[in-house]
Structure formats: C-alpha cells, structure tokens
C-alpha cells in the first residue's frame, strides 16, 4: 500500500474554478493538490464560449463578482504562464422589439445604479459601432467593459501556474471516497492513492453532486447542455461581443424560452473564429451535438 500523501488542501476538479482556486491558494504558500479525473479543462471549461460579459448579470452578488473578476484579467494575463487571449472588446445586448426595449431600460437602470458602465444606444448608434447589425433592430445596450478570453488557455494557465508555485497536479485520477474523522474531512481516497488533508474543496462542476454524496451532502446541480457553432477562420468582421436581449430573458426565465426562443450570443475570437451560441438543454450528461440544436442556432 502506498504511503498516504499529506497536503493542506485537496481541490477536486481542474476546470476553471478548481484550477483558479489551486493557483490562488498556492500563491499563499499552502500545500495544494489538484485532482482531475480527465484532463485540464476537459469538462465545461473546455466546451464554453469565451465571453467576459458583465451586462448579462443581475445586480447583486453575480454582477458584483463579475465586476471584480473583470478587474483581475489584465493582471492575470501578465502573471499566468500561458497566453490567455484576453481582450476588452466592449459588448452589446441587441434589442429587437418594444417589449425587449422596455425590459432592457429597467435592467440597464438597475445595473447603472450599482456602478456598471453601461448605457442604452439607439439603432443608428449601434450600427455605427457594428455596421453588420440589421437596420431592423431598435437599439442596444452597450458597455466598454465587456470582453473575451480563451477559457481553455485560462484554465491551463491557472493549473500550470499553480504547479509552478509548488502545487501538485494529478490528471486521470478519479476520487473514490472521502474519509472523515470526528465530523471533519481527513483524507481523499483515489484510484492513485490516498491524500490526507484538513480541507477538501469540491470544484467538480456538474459532477459536484457525486463528490458531495461521498460525505452525505445533497448538492442541487444539474447538467445543462449548451451547443455552440464554431466557424472556420474569418477576416475581422465584429468588433464587440454581442448577445440578444432574448438571451437575457431566456437566461433568467427558462420557462419562456420555448415561446420567445433562446436568444443568441456571438463573438469573433482573436484567431478569427466565430462562436455562435447557444442552446439550453437539460439532457443529462449527453454531450453530443445535434442537427436540431445547430439548426436552431444557425436560424437565429
């Protein structure tokens, strides 16, 4: 039997959240072990778009965290050992109907009241910023603070940055159990050995309920599939990251998505690819792309 490995903190899951936690704890000189049953960014963090989009957040803790997160990206771009392709492109929420305009007027007002740099602009102003926009839109909300990042590179940067600071990174390692002593975590059992630690952080994403169940915790997370179309490289056509007002409505009111549609998000990466998204489907852990899902995105 292998001798147990001792560490201060075990982080389960090397997606963007787990890798970020490991990196920042390692900067505080803690002994950190990062466990991942697949590879770095092999789950949701490697299958998402790259929007750093403040306008889609409701005032409150989500917008507060998003604003603080955005302030850190320039520093992270300099600190991390991997180019993360962060760009502050500005962002727009495109408004296509009077109902959307009314809703966005209130939404923008609430965001402005908590300090977000965002404003409503009319059709002509929006099309001046983005000439590719349809002449049939009513306008948009605009923030110069929105941007994009490469989520895979960012996750790899956190994980490899943590490793360079002394953290241990194990990929292809599955967690089998979590031991407790007197009501406290004492060790994590894996198929590669036992890791003794006083702190275990569950950053397993959609698999967090499986980890929670090992210590009797019911974690209310369900997987949701979001399909995205990725195009071939194109010449620069889009200056801003954009989403539709329908996207925000569907995000906060999933039950109305069947009526109004899921909306659309669109961005052009630094390399020229367009990312067009996305669907919102509760289909368990089915990761397959579907003709119907891609058709719905393309039809938007």
For each feature predicted by the language model, list its residue ranges.
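Glycine-rich FAD pyrophosphate-binding loop
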Residues: 26-46
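Dinucleotide-binding Rossmann-like beta1-alpha1 core, especially the glycine-rich loop
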Residues: 49-129, 263
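Active-site substrate-recognition segment that forms the wall
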Residues: 23-24, 50-53, 82-86, 184, ...
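Beta1/beta-strand and adjacent pyrophosphate-binding region of the FAD-binding site
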Residues: 3-15, 33
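N-terminal Rossmann-fold NAD(P) dinucleotide-binding loop
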Residues: 18
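Short beta-strand to alpha-helix junction loop
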Residues: 64, 94-103, 142-160, 288-293
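Helical element adjacent to the flavin cofactor pocket in flavoenzyme catalytic cores
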Residues: 141-198
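Gly/Ala-rich phosphate-binding loop of Rossmann-like dinucleotide-binding domains
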Residues: 22, 26, 161
């Amino acid at each position: 039997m292998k001798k147990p490995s001792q560490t201060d903190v075990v982080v389960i899951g090397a997606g963007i959240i787990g890798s970020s936690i490991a990196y920042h704890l390692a900067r505080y000189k803690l002994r950190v072990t990062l466990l991942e049953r697949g590879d770095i960014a092999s789950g949701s963090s490697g299958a998402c778009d790259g929007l750093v989009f403040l306008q889609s957040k409701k005032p409150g803790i989500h917008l507060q965290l998003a604003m603080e997160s955005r302030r850190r990206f320039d520093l992270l771009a300099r600190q991390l050992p991997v180019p993360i392709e962060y760009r502050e492109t500005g962002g727009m929420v495109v408004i296509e109907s009077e109902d959307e305009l009314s809703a966005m007027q209130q939404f923008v007002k609430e965001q402005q009241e908590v300090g977000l740099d965002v404003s409503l602009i009319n059709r002509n102003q929006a099309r001046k910023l983005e000439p590719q926009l349809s002449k049939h839109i009513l306008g948009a909300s605009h923030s110069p603070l929105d941007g994009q990042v490469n989520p895979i590179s960012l996750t790899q940067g956190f994980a490899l940055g943590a490793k360079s600071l002394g953290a241990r990174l194990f990929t292809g390692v599955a967690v089998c159990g979590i031991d407790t002593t007197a009501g406290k975590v004492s060790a994590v059992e894996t198929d590669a050995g036992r890791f003794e630690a006083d702190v275990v952080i569950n950053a397993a994403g959609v698999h967090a309920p499986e980890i929670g169940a090992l210590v009797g915790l019911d974690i209310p997370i369900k997987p949701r599939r979001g399909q995205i179309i990725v195009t071939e490289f194109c010449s620069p056509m889009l200056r801003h990251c954009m989403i539709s007002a329908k996207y925000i409505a569907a995000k906060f009111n999933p039950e109305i998505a069947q009526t109004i549609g899921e909306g659309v998000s669109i961005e052009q990466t630094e390399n020229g690819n367009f990312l067009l998204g996305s669907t919102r489907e509760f289909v368990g852990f089915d990761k397959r792309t579907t003709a119907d899902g891609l058709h719905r995105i393309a039809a938007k």
